[in-house]
């Protein structure tokens, strides 16, 4: 990848999309992770720091302190307006109002948290006449590794065309603080969760697999070149197929 060209195209994309929408700026969810750090950095490059609001939305009993610290470090480094909103009370009130919540599984609860954050982002975007800028990368989008109408509920996805491993490389080139680049990726939806453990494969390997699938490589070649197991490959392809609905608008019947 030509990273300088990619950087310039993403910046131009953000600028063009916000101009077309006639909005006054952007709201970005800042988790303390590298995807949101890169997205916020590129958005500031496109619009200027005065037009970017960063929202950090931890869950007090779950979000590691280091994530909140890193989110603040990033906001200070960028010089953007920054707010912290603890979602614990909102989620607790929601769960308390639904009797079935006690028997819900952790994925259901995790998705609720992601959708709560989406609602907060849009509240502030509507209030300020701004767009919600998403932080999803190409790896996550292809795998469907995000919450539908949660972190997937955004107005644009500036880094949606670059793989996770490329996110790390572009972030290094932009000088983003190193602690955000080197920490283990996690959606932070439950205690001890990490992306690679949940996926059952490293981002380095899964990006190689996704590239080869896009190029039309045969199964045997993918297994040989990447060194992954057939179980890991099947897991990746199942995710792509099972989550296709996330990458499309809701289907509408043809009536005429």
Swiss-Prot record:
Q: Which residues bind Mg(2+)?
A: 35, 140
Q: What Pfam families does the record tag this protein with? A: NAD_synthase (PF02540)
> Gene name on record?
nadE
**Lineage, top ranks:** Archaea, Methanobacteriati, Methanobacteriota, Stenosarchaea group, Methanomicrobia
Catalyses which reaction(s): deamido-NAD(+) + NH4(+) + ATP = AMP + diphosphate + NAD(+) + H(+)
Kindly state which keywords UniProt assigns to this record, in alphabetical order.
Answer: ATP-binding, Ligase, Magnesium, Metal-binding, NAD, Nucleotide-binding
The name this protein goes by in its record: NH(3)-dependent NAD(+) synthetase
Function of this protein? Catalyzes the ATP-dependent amidation of deamido-NAD to form NAD. Uses ammonia as a nitrogen source.
The EC category is: ligase
Matching SUPFAM superfamilies: Adenine nucleotide alpha hydrolases-like
Native organism: Methanosarcina acetivorans (strain ATCC 35395 / DSM 2834 / JCM 12185 / C2A)
């Amino acid at each position: 990848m030509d990273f300088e060209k990619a950087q310039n195209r993403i910046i131009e994309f953000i600028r063009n999309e916000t101009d077309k929408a006639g909005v006054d700026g952007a709201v970005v969810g800042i988790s303390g992770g590298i995807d949101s750090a890169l997205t916020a950095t590129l958005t500031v490059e496109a619009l200027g720091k005065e037009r970017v609001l960063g929202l950090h939305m931890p869950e007090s009993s779950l979000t590691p302190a280091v994530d909140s610290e890193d989110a603040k470090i990033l906001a200070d480094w960028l010089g953007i307006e920054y707010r912290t909103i603890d979602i614990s009370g909102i989620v607790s009130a929601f769960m308390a109002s639904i009797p079935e919540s006690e028997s819900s599984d952790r994925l259901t609860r995790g998705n609720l948290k992601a959708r709560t954050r989406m609602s907060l982002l849009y509240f502030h975007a509507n209030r300020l006449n701004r767009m919600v800028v998403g932080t999803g990368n190409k790896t996550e989008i292809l795998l469907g590794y995000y919450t539908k109408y949660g972190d997937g509920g955004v107005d644009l996805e500036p880094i949606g065309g670059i793989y996770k491993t490329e996110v790390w490389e572009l972030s290094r080139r932009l000088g983003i603080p190193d602690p955000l680049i080197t920490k283990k990726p996690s959606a932070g939806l439950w205690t001890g969760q990490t992306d690679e453990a949940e996926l059952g494969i490293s981002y380095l390997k899964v990006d190689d697999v996704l590239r080869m699938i896009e190029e039309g490589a045969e199964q045997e070649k993918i297994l040989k070149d990447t060194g992954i197991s057939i179980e890991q490959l099947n897991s990746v392809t199942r995710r792509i197929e099972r989550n296709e609905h996330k990458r499309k608008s809701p289907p509408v019947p043809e009536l005429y």
